[in-house]
Structures are given as C-alpha cells and as structure tokens.
C-alpha cells in the first residue's frame, strides 16, 4: 500500500490497521509524493514536499495506490509517474475514499468508498480521527 499526501498517507495507516485487525495480515506500506511530477504546479500552489518512503523494491509487486479524493486525475497521474521512477510494478491499483467526478484524464479508481458528484467550484475533504479529531467526508 502506498499513500499519497496528505490524507492518502493517513488513510493508508487506517486501512493497514483495519486489515490487520480483521485478518491478521501485515502489509508493507509506503508513501509517494507526486509534487515534482505534476503538470499543474502553478495552479495548485506550493506545499511542504514529503520524502518518498518505499520500504521494499516494487519490481514485479502489486501496488495499491491510496488517496482520499479523486477529482481531475492529475494527482494520480503524477503519483504513478513518481512510483514508476522507483521501478516497474507488476500491477498498480487505485483506492480512493471519494470520487467527485470531473476527470480530465482517463484514470478511474479500482476501489471507491463513495461517489459524490460535485460542481467544479465545490471541494470535498476527508477528515480522519487520528489527524483531525473528527471523521467524515465534508463538502465545502
């Protein structure tokens, strides 16, 4: 499992703990920051860059890429470019908690918690207890 900043990393932690509590299965988890691979940096602004943490070689491994919300698909495309700079996985699957539509690239999640159609001027945020002291999906 590989989380994308910011909430994708926290979501990866939550999912890893839940998977272990239900199955006893431990999975390796990591993080990948797509910032340097984005094609829209001037539009999304700047933020603190997080170092990638890929704990194992990814060659011929199945990778579950995790993010909180999918919108245009640009973050996922950039994250996949960053991931492939570490090697060539056998398969990459995508898990998101919320799909709000409005894709600009042909990228679709393999696993989606909820589809929440929004207008382009609205935004959605995922809040998690371990970070935000509240839990839910919020339309803003």
Protein language model regions, located:
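PRPP-associated nucleotide enzymes
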Residues: 1-140
